[in-house]
Amino acid sequence: MKTLFLGVTLGLAAALSFTLEEEDITGTWYVKAMVVDKDFPEDRRPRKVSPVKVTALGGGNLEATFTFMREDRCIQKKILMRKTEEPGKFSAYGGRKLIYLQELPGTDDYVFYCKDQRRGGLRYMGKLVGRNPNTNLEALEEFKKLVQHKGLSEEDIFMPLQTGSCVLEH
């Protein structure tokens, strides 16, 4: 019985991992809604966001690239997301951040959910993303359910202004 359970579990894990790789997670994603935990400073919440470009690096690893303005300068941020044993789970910054990618059923949208370990504490952030900048109300409702399931408050969901990528200075 244990052997059968182990076989089914490993098969399911392999199937889930295969599904995530098969579904094209690469490309441009538009941030439609965000949520952060209550400990996240209000003044650090992004009011404007650029699209996120996800690139496959091989071996199941991904790179997420986006730009933002800081003190009138365009800054580009690249995050190396290393594949873990758990399907849909990636680590970044030496394991300090754990990033989960979850497709929302019945939509073309995903949730990028992040646990960030800082100075002995944990911070949580979630992003509802899609292939186009239009907000899908079904996906937004699913995002709200997921937010509550993760222990975050629906009241902390906000919709930043979607902008284009800024131009880097050379």
Swiss-Prot record:
One GO MF term attached to the UniProt entry: odorant binding
GO cellular component, one term: extracellular space
Keywords: Disulfide bond, Olfaction, Secreted, Sensory transduction, Signal, Transport
Record's signal peptide: 1-15
Localization annotation: Secreted
Keyword Signal (UniProt): yes
Major location (coarse): secreted
Effect of residue 77 to A: No effect on binding affinity for undecanal, palmitic acid, efficient aldehydes, benzenic aldehydes, heterocyclic aldehydes or aliphatic acids
Coiled-coil segments on the chain, per record: none
Disulfide bonds: 74-166
Function statement: Binds and transports small hydrophobic volatile molecules with a higher affinity for aldehydes and large fatty acids, including undecanal, palmitic acid, efficient aldehydes, benzenic aldehydes, heterocyclic aldehydes and aliphatic acids.
Family that this chain belongs to: Belongs to the calycin superfamily. Lipocalin family.
Family annotation (PANTHER family): LIPOCALIN, ODORANT-BINDING PROTEIN 2A-RELATED
Protein name: Odorant-binding protein 2a
Species annotation: Homo sapiens (Human)
Species classification: Eukaryota, Metazoa, Chordata, Craniata, Vertebrata
